Amino acid sequence: MKRLTDGQKYMGSIREIAKLAGVSPASVSIYLNDKKTSRVGAATKQRIDQAVKDLHYHKNIFASTLSLQESRIIGIIIPSKMPLFSNEYTNSLLSGVQSQLSNEGYSLLFFPSDARTSDEIVEQQIQRSTGCDGYILFSTGFCTQAHIEKNIMELQKTDKPFVTLNIPEMEQARLQVLIRDLEICSGTKYLLGKGHRNIALMLGRDGGVHARKLYHDHRSLLEHANVAFDPDTVVFGDYQAQRAYEQAKDLLTSFPHLTALNCMSDIMAAGAILAAKDMGLRVPEDISIMGRNNSLHARLSTPAITTIDLHIEDAGKSAAHLLLAAIDGSAVSQKILIPGTLIERDTVSTIA
């Protein structure tokens, strides 16, 4: 068989590897499934390795594990139209999931989707990842409550264990990892405790299930403190610095009496800080700005951003650990709460 040049793209089969190496297909199969096997000689292994390299062969993981009734692969379901690695929050979650799975000998699988809505994206991702041992379902800003409920129903149809991550508490999901900035470390409550009474809120995406809950929590805390709530002081920054910059400028122009802005991500807080500076306002002397997530943006911003550390990577590790426990039968129904931690830095002042 003619050898392929480096620039050619081709995936060889086991029979083609055997032919090129001058060995039997059985020897190739035995060796590729167990590189340490003593049933194949060292010289034969070298010829197989060279043929694999020349043919650009990649093992079909699902097919090779069918006899074991397991793939040791976990499917990640992320209903988002954004590029997977463009979001630091998602990256931290995935880092936690992947590191825990890797420690346990499992691989991570993600299939992108060209669908338009979050529920259609999830349906496609499930179809393309058939053969996984289990799933981890993320929620993103594109998800409404109805979409999340439908996504959970789709996963239930697979008869495979799954864990929900970054999703509000739901009865339909038996295995959940809940990320919470509890009232004790809520940004709004912290600002109230610092003497602020004119507090605006910058949420992520309008219509998202997280935005709805955070809106309710913010309003409830203000009302409990006998502070009037004005819905016009709630804006959406879409988790983007530029959009947050624009929204913060409009907000601070329309409501010059504001003393604090509680942003639901550090990247939005960074955009808001830049807007305040461009308007000639000092942070935190003229306007206090709070973030959320304790990301790199919070640490590198000038001034450094006071924020809520949601321990995102730990949440990802917990989700992977819980799913593997479900796969081996030791977890049937469990909810793990990851509480946030207040990180005080330089963007919030105290009002006497």
Task: For the regions a language model picked out, list residue spans one by one.
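Short acidic capping loops at alpha-helix termini that bridge into adjacent secondary structure
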Residues: 197-198, 229-233, 283-288
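Periplasmic-binding protein-like
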Residues: 132-140, 163, 200-202, 234, ...
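Alpha-helical recognition/docking segments in bacterial nutrient-uptake
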Residues: 1-9, 69, 73-189, 193, ...
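Hinge/beta->alpha junction and helix N-cap segments in small-molecule ligand-binding domains
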Residues: 80-92, 110-119, 141-143, 175-186, ...
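N-terminal helix-turn-helix DNA-binding module of bacterial transcription factors
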Residues: 1-70
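Flexible loop/turn connectors
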Residues: 249-352
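Short acidic/polar active-site loop segments enriched in Thr and Asp
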Residues: 24, 72, 133, 196-198, ...
